């Protein structure tokens, strides 16, 4: 099943802000799920975020996501495993690692793309 939102960029920013304002396990899980399952993969997601990546609110939201997923032991990956109610230690470690790697790969791809000039000429 695919649930469409208007755009991934405002969704990620909103969820990033929610990470700081409330502590619900579903917020990091939503971020992980959407990043991992985005149609077209990380490159398509990063291309959609790219035109907005220099805006203050977007940087703030992505920064809060980066903080929450700064390591496999940070609140982001741990909340993903908690939300899925994973109790097996090996499976839990794998899920935390997977969440950490997906989110950090997305953030790095956005950084790489936003460092290059926009081919459309937009700022």
What residue spans do the PLM features occupy?
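Compositionally biased terminal segments of proteins
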Residues: 1-123
């Amino acid at each position: 099943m695919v649930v469409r939102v208007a755009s991934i960029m405002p969704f990620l920013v909103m969820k990033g802000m929610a990470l700081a304002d409330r502590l619900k396990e579903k917020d990091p899980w939503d971020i992980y799920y959407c990043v991992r399952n985005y149609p077209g993969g990380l490159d398509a997601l990063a291309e959609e975020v790219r035109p907005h990546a220099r805006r203050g609110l977007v940087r703030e939201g992505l920064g809060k996501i980066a903080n929450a997923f700064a390591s496999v032991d940070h609140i982001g990956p741990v909340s993903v495993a908690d939300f899925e109610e994973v109790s097996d230690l090996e499976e839990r470690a794998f899920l935390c690692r997977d969440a950490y790697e997906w989110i950090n790969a997305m953030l790095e791809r956005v950084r790489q793309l936003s460092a290059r000039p926009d081919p459309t000429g937009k700022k």
